[in-house]
């Protein structure tokens, strides 16, 4: 046996022993296996390289087996080994980006399992070499129910399907491999390739095909069913696919490089490039980074049958900038890695001007920060995922960016303003890295994006400035109240014209502006925060009032709950977008925990108000971007400005109220209480049985057996009405729907508006929906909107809308949203979508796939959506893991540091 085989088998033996001994501890096992993988891949690459020199490796000198660089170079030049190249790159990038804790190792090992199976299969086929013989014992899937589900799908995948390739194009949003009997299959999440499609319009399909996810694709899709829990669940099978970048995306990319072209999908150059990308599994950036000889070969192949070259004229220009590392190269790297029409349009200068600092590309100057420091800056209107960046941009010499990114994410994602030096153990010379980062910033950005420190705690300067400015402004307006305020409220109440039947709310109203001109009202879910807003609005009935909230559903809720005159209601985004300065006597902001620091400082700078009411719950889902001001205000603003509502009104169910309190306080006996009161249930068919007409199923994820898509398919199959297909989605009369964000029907149909399909008519190029919506409108409301009012009752209205399909729709840059269905089927919805809504019955599904994503705020928000019945579907193991991991972030370190800094 040659030395190379000895080395490979020695590594394999080590992996085998680890799996054999440590199956019950996936984190520890993953850590040990990951330590072996780089060496494993590199020696496999050498074996293939040496074999390519001579089919018989027995006569090859031993020193050849040490040529790791030659081995890696060989596999990079052969499309068969693209998976091996990708695996090696991932191992390298993971080592530089992750601390190899057991938890991180476990995540990575699950991601890499697919590649290990490919190695096993290739070495057996090519050399009859048996490796990874017990890899099937690695505990990939810890849920037996999921295994049964996927086995039934695999039975369908193994059948031969013949279906036509779609004319429609799709973007692949997520590819999740799953494994049955050492074979690899994929669960694909995809959506229409349309600039206006909502991120919530996701479809799930299954395939044996390893589909490239960088670009738009065409799919051959077949409808089928599998039997789950005695019910036939509709599924989609992808039997074939092809790369099909939208021609308008190539046109836009070319414009950025000052090459005006008009590509058609019928062009030979286009067709051969799409075919080559699929066959070689090289994305456009991979092609651009090939050595000159290989690049010219690809170019010659793709353009062989073309009378005129269009695409490669653009790619030649692009390659020259990227290979020579000229300014603009990182923007081009990312855009060529992910051709996406919407993203590219956002980068262009609105007047079509050149950016001199980025090699005269036709992009806006706002692209410069990303080009210079891509790991800690965003493109215009787009925040790239870290793994996409790691794939297309080298990290060498960018450690300062990775450190800054970690500090930034700790604030934006974890809500921590200050990050301790102890959290940066994987970085060396932190002080020097921060100096480098700060000096590389554009001088005008150093005060906002720069990193500062308080002792051994680091922070983003702009984040700290925002929260300090907010708190100082609130402290300033809390110094004095309204003279004779309490007496005036007492007098108003004594007239009997307005009744407040809650003693606590009456006392708050009497004192809220006695000593302060700002009132912060905190309250748990269902304690009547909206009612309190209504009381205050009615007392100030003659004064001009502006009521703001972050979302359309929250604004709509205020409109329903507030009956006072002289009120104007707006979303925060709409208010800030308006250029006119708006004055008011009373400014009220609802759901303050969802308002980011940056938005709040803008509101305080723009608004001209005399009194301010801030309302929210710090235990519900927080701001998407960094927003900790409302939590910190509770300990930094005068106590005379702080009020708390404690008595719940959403429900009178004592066990349910006790549960809310226990989750809110994260009490020690939470698991026992959930069990004793039958709130915890194992996942079974009962989740699909409707217990109440006003019922919702809440999930955190869209894919998987118990994801939103599958639950909707299950429950829709119970609907006896005829199914009407539009694209890959089925609709039925009687389906509940939830509207997405759409400018086409705004403000009548808004994000999160609930409705029900009352009629469907399908034509060749048009589908017409009649939707009953839970709001009453009149004919004047829909003037100038593409809506028809069919009927209206005391509590609802039925509106008619049309969605169209045009030939070669995705070829062109179609800005129209009349091709997009503006709602999603909503038997089940996401927990985030449910915020601000309430139901008689809530069923919450938490699987082991998403247990790490369940935070204290997410769990609390989910369980407080119900007024009567609650069931949480999870395994005992998942329940234990979630309860043990959720924590209440008290932000004590942030509070302590800020107290010292505030005036």
Question: What residue spans do the PLM features occupy?
Answer:
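Extended low-complexity, intrinsically disordered and solenoidal helical-scaffold regions
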Residues: 2-216
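Conserved RecA-like ASCE P-loop NTPase motor core of nucleic-acid helicases/translocases
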Residues: 519-562, 615, 671-715, 719, ...
């Amino acid at each position: 046996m040659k030395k190379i085989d000895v080395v490979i088998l020695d590594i394999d033996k080590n992996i085998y022993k680890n799996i054999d001994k440590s199956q019950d501890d996936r984190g520890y096992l993953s850590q040990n296996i990951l330590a072996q993988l780089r060496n494993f891949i590199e020696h496999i690459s050498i074996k293939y390289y040496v074999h390519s020199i001579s089919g018989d490796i027995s006569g090859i000198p031993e020193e050849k087996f040490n040529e790791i660089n030659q081995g890696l170079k060989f596999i990079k030049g052969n499309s068969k080994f693209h998976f091996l190249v990708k695996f090696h790159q991932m191992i390298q990038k993971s080592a530089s980006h992750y601390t190899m804790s057991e938890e991180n190792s476990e995540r990575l090992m699950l991601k890499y399992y697919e590649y290990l199976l490919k190695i096993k299969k290739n070495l057996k086929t090519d050399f009859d070499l048996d490796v990874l013989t017990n890899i099937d014992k690695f505990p990939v899937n810890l849920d037996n129910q999921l295994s049964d589900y996927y086995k039934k799908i695999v039975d369908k995948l193994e059948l031969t399907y013949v279906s036509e390739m779609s004319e429609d194009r799709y973007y692949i949003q997520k590819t999740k491999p799953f494994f049955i009997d050492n074979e690899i299959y994929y669960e694909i999440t995809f959506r229409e390739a349309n600039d206006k499609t909502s991120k919530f319009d996701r479809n799930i399909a299954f395939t044996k095909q390893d589909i490239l996810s960088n670009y738009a694709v065409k799919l051959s899709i077949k409808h089928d069913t599998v039997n789950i829990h005695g019910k036939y669940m509709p599924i989609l099978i992808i039997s074939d696919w092809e790369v099909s970048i939208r021609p308008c995306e190539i046109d836009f990319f070319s414009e950025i490089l000052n090459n005006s072209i008009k590509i058609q999908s019928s062009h030979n150059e286009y067709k051969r490039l799409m075919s080559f990308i699929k066959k070689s599994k090289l994305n456009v950036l991979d092609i651009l980074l090939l050595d000159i000889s290989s690049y010219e070969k690809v170019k010659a192949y793709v353009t062989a049958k073309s009378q005129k070259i269009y695409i490669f004229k653009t790619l030649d220009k692009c390659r020259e900038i990227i290979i020579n590392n000229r300014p603009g190269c990182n923007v081009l790297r990312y855009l060529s890695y992910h051709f996406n029409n919407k993203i590219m349009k956002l980068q262009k200068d609105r007047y079509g001007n050149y950016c001199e600092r980025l090699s005269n590309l036709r992009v806006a100057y706002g692209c410069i920060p990303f080009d210079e420091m891509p790991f800690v800056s965003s493109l215009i209107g787009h925040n790239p995922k870290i793994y996409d960046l790691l794939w297309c941009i080298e990290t060498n010499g960018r450690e300062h960016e990775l450190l800054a990114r970690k500090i930034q994410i700790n604030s934006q994602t974890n809500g921590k303003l200050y990050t301790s030096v102890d959290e940066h153990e994987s970085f060396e010379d932190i002080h020097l890295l921060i100096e480098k980062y700060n000096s590389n910033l554009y001088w005008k950005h150093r005060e906002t994006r720069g990193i500062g420190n308080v002792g051994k705690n680091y922070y983003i300067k702009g984040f700290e400035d925002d929260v300090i400015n907010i708190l100082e402004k609130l402290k300033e307006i809390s110094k004095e109240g309204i003279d004779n305020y309490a007496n005036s409220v007492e007098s108003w109440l004594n007239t009997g014209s307005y009744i407040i039947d809650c003693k606590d709310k009456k006392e708050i109203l009497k004192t809220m502006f006695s000593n302060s001109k700002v009132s912060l009202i905190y309250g748990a879910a269902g304690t009547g925060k909206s009612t309190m807003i209504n009381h205050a609005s009615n007392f100030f009935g003659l004064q001009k009032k502006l009521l703001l909230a972050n979302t359309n559903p929250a604004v709509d809720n205020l409109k329903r709950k507030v009956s006072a005159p002289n009120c104007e209601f707006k979303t925060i985004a709409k208010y800030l977008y308006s250029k006119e300065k708006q004055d008011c006597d009373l400014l009220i902001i609802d759901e303050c925990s969802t308002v980011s620091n940056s938005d709040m400082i803008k509101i305080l700078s723009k608004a001209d108000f005399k009194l301010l009411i801030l309302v929210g719950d710090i235990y519900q889902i927080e701001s998407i971007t960094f927003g900790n001001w409302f939590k910190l205000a509770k300990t930094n603003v005068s106590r005379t400005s702080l009020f708390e509502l404690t008595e719940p009104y959403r429900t009178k169910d004592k066990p349910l109220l006790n549960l809310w309190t226990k989750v809110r306080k994260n009490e020690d006996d939470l698991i026992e209480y959930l069990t004793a009161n039958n709130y915890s249930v194992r996942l079974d068919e009962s989740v699909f049985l409707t217990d109440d007409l006003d019922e919702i199923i809440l999930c955190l994820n869209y894919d998987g057996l118990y994801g939103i898509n599958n639950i909707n398919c299950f429950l829709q199959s119970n609907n006896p009405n005829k199914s009407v297909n539009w694209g890959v989605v089925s609709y039925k009369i009687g389906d509940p729907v939830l509207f997405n964000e759409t400018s086409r029907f705004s403000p009548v149909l808004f994000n999160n508006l609930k409705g029900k399909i009352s009629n469907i008519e399908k034509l060749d190029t048009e589908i017409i929906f009649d939707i009953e919506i839970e709001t009453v409108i009149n004919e004047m409301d829909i003037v100038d909107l593409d809506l028809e009012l069919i009927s209206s009752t005391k509590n609802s209205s039925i509106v008619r809308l049309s969605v169209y399909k045009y030939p070669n729709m995705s070829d062109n840059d179609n800005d129209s949203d009349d091709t997009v269905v503006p709602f999603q089927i909503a038997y089940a919805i996401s927990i985030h979508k449910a915020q601000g809504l309430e139901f008689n019955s809530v069923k919450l599904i938490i699987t082991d796939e998403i247990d790490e994503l369940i935070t204290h705020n997410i769990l609390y928000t989910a369980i407080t959506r119900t007024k009567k019945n609650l069931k949480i579907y999870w395994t005992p193991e998942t329940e234990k893991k979630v309860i043990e991991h959720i924590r209440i972030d008290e932000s004590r370190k942030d509070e302590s540091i800020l107290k010292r800094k505030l005036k």
